[in-house]
């Protein structure tokens, strides 16, 4: 079990670090309105929604961002770390190599969390 906890922690950290790097590069934003504006101007983006955000807010964003790749395996507190705040529910990344890497790592984390 100790190994499983460590693996999950490392996968989570990898995802958070990729989002933080994208933010520093100007390729990521957080917050409902910022994400909506971002997606309106950049339809080839990646959307990340905290899996513990309010259901109505998550569903509204999913409808707005229909067709945009979506990640939902991170908690609001985990996303918040990437932006230096307590929580972040909605995050968008530009169509960049970091988004591709994040999709890969998030898929690994999702599979691991489903198994664990």
Regions found by a protein language model. Give the residues of each.
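Internal, active-site/partner-interface "lid" segment
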Residues: 112-116
């Amino acid at each position: 079990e100790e190994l499983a906890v460590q693996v999950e922690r490392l996968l989570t950290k990898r995802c958070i670090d990729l989002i933080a790097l994208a933010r520093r590069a100007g390729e990521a934003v957080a917050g409902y309105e910022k994400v909506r504006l971002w997606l309106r101007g950049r339809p080839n983006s990646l959307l990340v929604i905290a899996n513990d955000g309010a259901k109505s807010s998550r569903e509204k964003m999913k409808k707005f961002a229909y067709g945009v790749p979506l990640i939902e395996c991170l908690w609001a507190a985990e996303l918040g770390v990437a932006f230096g705040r307590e929580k972040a529910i909605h995050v968008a990344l530009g169509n960049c190599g970091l988004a591709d890497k994040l999709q890969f790592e998030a898929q690994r984390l999702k599979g691991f969390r489903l198994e664990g």
